[in-house]
Amino acid sequence: MASSSDSEDDSVMAVDQEETALEGTMEQDEDPHPVLEVEETRHNRSMSELPEEVLEYILSFLSPYQEHKTAALVCKQWYRLIKGVAHQCYHGFMKAVQEGNIQWESRTYPYPGTPITQRFSHSACYYDANQSMYVFGGCTQSSCNAAFNDLWRLDLNSKEWIRPLASGSYPSPKAGATLVVYKDLLVLFGGWTRPSPYPLHQPERFFDEIHTYSPSKNWWNCIVTTHGPPPMAGHSSCVIGDKMIVFGGSLGSRQMSNEVWVLDLEQWAWSKPNISGPSPHPRGGQSQIVIDDTTLLILGGCGGPNALFKDAWLLHMHPGPWAWQPLKVENEDHGAPELWCHPACRVGQCVVVFSQAPSGRAPLSPSLNSRPSPISATPPALVPETREYRSQSPVRSMDEAPCVNGRWGTLRPRAQRQTPSGSREGSLSPARGDGSPILNGGNLSPGTVAVGGASLDSPVQVVSPSTPSASDGYDLKVGLSLAPRRGSLPDQKDLRLSSIDLNWDLKSASSSSHVDSIDNRTVAGSVRHPPEQTNGVHTPPHVASALAGAVSPGALRRSLEAIKAMSSKGPSASAALSPPLGSSPSSPGSQSLSSGETVPNSRPGPAQGDGHSLPPIARRLGHHPPQSLNVGKPLYQSMNCKPMQMYVLDIKDTKEKGRVKWKVFTSSSVVGPPETSLHTVVQGRGELIVFGGLMDKKQNVKYYPKTNALYFVRAKR
């Protein structure tokens, strides 16, 4: 009964509230002023009225640095939510690294602040007090004799480079030093620098100096110690408690070290601990990871020429004698190819290394959030020149051509060998007419038609002649405007490529005897992927539609391959190379190659090369032929198919089972920007910062930003 009476009272109260609401509504209809007050109330709603789940999701887009700190000061609710967001950011990033579910953000192009000088072999560390990354020293690729002693600070909240003008005793200009954080100080130790060019034959200089930098005071201080390690560079160091542990390094004169030194950061005194058992080989350039307060992990390194290490060692720092323990490395085939010049960084129970992608053909990361690269725009036509270049055979005494005026890979002409008939022996080069420029680029463009309307979509290999005489006489014009060659060969056929005419010197008997047979293919069908080695000509798998007046080795090579394919089929195929004068290769419909055989016109579309397309770089090349390419490999591999990939080493079973294991990823998100070496990797708040480094000259670094690039690796949203 009591419950029924209570329900009745509740119903009565509900009715009374409805009546009151109706009366209030009637009064509002009579008086317009309360309506304005209600509308004001609706417009004055704040974010505090949102559900906490929605608010927490919105706050997760804030920068984990200063923006988190500022948002936590708004109210108690936001303070509590920011703590959860920061925790989720950290652990979410660790999980993303373990699963390979990351994204890359690029700061390769000009960003706020004074641009830092391009460098490699520099030192870097993260200082949480002002949420910045500090970079010291290094050297530059433009001058091997130049080393820096400048200090830069990257504000990770604004992504702005700041150069603090510090006072005190500056360190010497050097590279290969280590920079670690101890309390409110940055400790710099070791390093090396190249000698001045004159006088000649001076040795490199190595340092054993210790400098400290105080970010709060903006002050450098030189620490004088005694009975310390010899001058060294390329060593590794870390801080555990109030001790800095230093291992290995290069001592100069091709001498490496495997000694361990300990610096007391309170007393600034060196000591050398007693270590029992076998020890790692002397090395430099290794990575040193802190496992816990009594254990260190040493990974990789270089012991000298042809002595690159991929091993892993544990250093147990017990109260008694210290001891080394070798670790078993599992899934080594899926590990980083090179460890000595690619530093490692710990993220949770994993160690992250950024090294070269194993396949060498993986595309660059599609998640690089930067402005379009200069290599991704459609280039203008290359301006013809009057000089002549001839291809070099990959089999030669020197791996690369010398560097002349900063250009690598200059193709030098060969002596021509004349035959009794007056033509050059084994020559497969074209004879150009006055109005027959050659196409630009390494491929025929998607809309370009070859051999009576057929489109060649895949890279085609030009096989070097088998005989020395044919090799000496092999001639190829690269990016040039040449005078027509008359009288070389009696039979000349007209091969039309798009709107551009190419006059080729055909000699069926000579070409069939000196050119190897190729796989069964038709001009209309797709061509199989050739081997990577070419005859000294480097060609990207896709080049956009070229304009008249441009010359490229790829167009010559592909057209030459079409001639070989047709000449191997007999006289009927050779006759089809000369289309009627009234026919246009770019006319709609299909055109006849021989009786009963037609080839439809190819539609425009991205050309495919090894499973992915690659835009050209001719705009950056200007009117020069490619000069800094890797001889014997296609251009797209030399420039764009050596990306940097994330490798993850699982270290959770290091102490218990004495093993480490490389993780296997199938996701393409681990593939990032072009590979660099001697860069730095620093862990911030829920991200990794990769800065600087040295890019191999074989990756066409002259036309791609290289050594002051800045990348952020974060968890993929």
Swiss-Prot record:
Q: What ranges does the record list as Low complexity composition bias?
A: 363-376, 570-595
Q: Which residues form the F-box domain?
A: 44-93
Record keywords: Kelch repeat, Phosphoprotein, Repeat, Ubl conjugation pathway
PTM sites of type Phosphothreonine: T378
Q: Where is the composition biased (Acidic residues)?
A: 1-30
Q: Where is this region: Disordered?
A: 1-34, 361-452, 570-632
User: Which SUPFAM superfamilies does UniProt cross-reference here?
Assistant: F-box domain, Kelch motif
Q: Where are the Kelch repeats?
A: 132-184, 186-242, 244-293, 295-342
Tell me which SMART domains the record gives: FBOX
- Phosphoserine-modified residues are S365, S373, S552
Top-rank taxon, per record: Eukaryota
Which Gene3D superfamilies does the record associate with it? 1.20.1280.50, Kelch-type beta propeller
Here the segments flagged for biased composition (Polar residues) are 416-426
Complex and partners: Component of some SCF complex, composed of CUL1, SKP1, RBX1 and FBXO42. Interacts (via the kelch domain) with p53/TP53; interaction is direct.
**Its biological purpose:** Substrate-recognition component of some SCF (SKP1-CUL1-F-box protein)-type E3 ubiquitin ligase complex. Specifically recognizes p53/TP53, promoting its ubiquitination and degradation.
What's the protein called, per UniProt?
A: F-box only protein 42
| Species per Swiss-Prot/TrEMBL record | Mus musculus
Coding gene?
Fbxo42
